[in-house]
Amino acid sequence: MKKIGIGMLKGIESSIVSRNYMNIALIKPSEDNKEQLIEMLDEWKHDIETNHTNPSPRRIFRYDHHDFTNYLEQLDVKEPVPAGRVPTTTLFCYDYDKNIFVGAVNIRHYLDEGLLHSGGHIGDGIRPNERRKGYATAMIALALKECKKLGIERVLMCCRKDNIGSAKSIINNGGVLENEVLDEDDVLTQRYWIDL
């Protein structure tokens, strides 16, 4: 089964990909799927607090998702860009077969010094109960299409060295390891480049 379709969702063109029987897309949440988004974020936040896991992408955890309208307004950084920020687009990965959100990406439109060092163009993450099912690889593939639409020709993705699953997902999308650096938290981080 191989389906690829293109559709408009809240002004963001998003590809729908079936990969290993996955029917997923990167979308902007709306009132129609508010409950599914809150359920995912509640589960994810509980995992972060209980297991002290890395909150990635961090942007989706900066605001109270129960204040839904304000939450959606805060997700993206738009022009004019505040000092110390770059424009970003945050999209959530929706599985249409399961009717749930499974992850999120935060796409930085260009890199500043800090992002070039250890942040990259794409921050991504998969909700705890849906990890190790292939979603990350498929979601990154969709995020790379969004990067291409923004005119980005070479994408930097970074992950902590101990995050083997994330590294595999990046490599599965053509990531080539350039080097390892210490991030802002002094954690060893791998820097991968993907040519589009």
Regions inferred by a protein language model and the residue ranges of each:
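Conserved acetyl-CoA-binding loop-helix of GNAT-fold acetyltransferases
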Residues: 123-126, 132-145, 168-172
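Conserved beta-strand-loop-alpha-helix junction that forms the acyl-donor binding cleft
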Residues: 157-165
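GNAT-family acyltransferases
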Residues: 9-121, 186-196
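Short coil/turn motifs at secondary-structure junctions
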Residues: 110-112, 129, 162
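Conserved catalytic-core motifs of GNAT/GCN5-like acyltransferases
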Residues: 158-159, 174-191
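Conserved GNAT acetyl-CoA-binding A-motif
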Residues: 149-158
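Charged catalytic carboxylate motif
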Residues: 36, 139, 165
